[in-house]
Amino acid sequence: MSIEVRGLSKRFGAFRALDEVSLHIETGELVALLGPSGCGKTTLLRIIAGLESADAGSVLFAGEDATEVDVRQRQVGFVFQHYALFKHMTVFENVAFGLRVRHRSQRPSEARIRAKVLDLLGLVQLDWLADRYPAQLSGGQRQRIALARALAVEPRVLLLDEPFGALDAKVRKELRRWLRRLHDELHVASVFVTHDQEEALEVTDRVVLMNAGRIEQVGSPREVWERPATPFVYGFLGDVNQLHGHATRGVWRLGEVALPAPDLPEADNQRAIAYVRPHDIDLARAGTAAPGIPVRLNHVYLAGPSAYLELARQDDQAIIEAQVPEPLFRSLGLKEGEALLAQPRRARVFAVQP
């Protein structure tokens, strides 16, 4: 079942949480709402679920207006960050809860409930824990039980609010890949909130970048990473250097360095900022003929397969960060304090707004 929101707005006092947000999610899509704290992503998720009401706009499921439909009638599965499992109930009872509290006319028989719960526990690969209590489970196991409970009511859509936020990094990575495989089996529209860029880019079909209550960009993980639509998206999706220069007729310049600026074909000495990823900066020793930004190597941080270099520009001491493979760094024999040239290889150029 598809999900569509049209012109959603929401205020909490003077704070505007959502500002005319519109979005369409197809059946079977796994979509991430990604952004910093306070950007509106959780508010949007809760309005879709029916846990929050909008000041304006509408929510449609499969083309039908669900804005005024009670949360209990929306057939939405919701998974919270902190599991919200009932401590006094076993795993089996937690998963069965949503089925047992249905109105008598809609409640399955106890035999069907048992079969359904055991099927779901098998689906999340935890059927052997049916008689345990939440306190006896790991964080990853609790989150999978919470997901099984959400699926028990056969939701038309699945909504997850930072489902892996309370887990350590290794478990998060394992669970999000497991969620991707599970989602492909279920084939329902699924939306999850996260502030983890890697998480959103790794497992989703599309990423919705949000900022200050608005959508900045919607696209596939590859699209938003390779072609960020705004400076905010560029900065939020990873480390980035901002180099201030000028653009003229589609070319950005800073000293001897020139880079294409295809989005500014009519610019005439216009102030513009080149956004450059650390791994898109090459290094050369000072005195070579190639153009570059004169810098001095301040510090080197080695982390696994990469070396992260902190470079200070020689004109204004502004910091430029570069990332190179550790074997290359070793072969170059660079020393802290050495004069170098930073050579941006690729960038996205945005005009400075007056």
Curated annotation (Swiss-Prot):
Disulfide bonds: none annotated. Transmembrane segments: none annotated. It comes from the Bacteria. It is an enzyme of class 7 (translocase). Its EC number is 7.3.2.3. ATP binds at residues 35-42. GO terms for molecular function: ABC-type sulfate transporter activity; ABC-type thiosulfate transporter activity; ATP binding; ATP hydrolysis activity. Pfam families: ABC_tran, CysA_C_terminal, TOBE_3. Keywords: ATP-binding, Cell inner membrane, Cell membrane, Membrane, Nucleotide-binding, Sulfate transport, Translocase, Transport. The keyword ATP-binding applies. Residues 3-237 form the ABC transporter domain. The keyword Lyase does not apply. Its main location: membrane. Gene3D superfamilies: P-loop containing nucleotide triphosphate hydrolases. It is a peripheral membrane protein. One of its GO terms (cellular component) is ATP-binding cassette (ABC) transporter complex. It catalyses: sulfate(out) + ATP + H2O = sulfate(in) + ADP + phosphate + H(+); thiosulfate(out) + ATP + H2O = thiosulfate(in) + ADP + phosphate + H(+). It is found in: Cell inner membrane. InterPro entries: AAA+_ATPase (IPR003593), ABC_SmlMolc_Importer (IPR050093), ABC_transporter-like_ATP-bd (IPR003439), ABC_transporter-like_CS (IPR017871), CysA_C (IPR041193), Mo/tungstate-bd_C_term_dom (IPR008995), P-loop_NTPase (IPR027417), Sulph_transpt1 (IPR005666). The complex is composed of two ATP-binding proteins (CysA), two transmembrane proteins (CysT and CysW) and a solute-binding protein (CysP). Part of the ABC transporter complex CysAWTP involved in sulfate/thiosulfate import. Responsible for energy coupling to the transport system. Belongs to the ABC transporter superfamily. Sulfate/tungstate importer (TC 3.A.1.6) family. This is Sulfate/thiosulfate import ATP-binding protein CysA. It comes from Bordetella pertussis (strain Tohama I / ATCC BAA-589 / NCTC 13251).
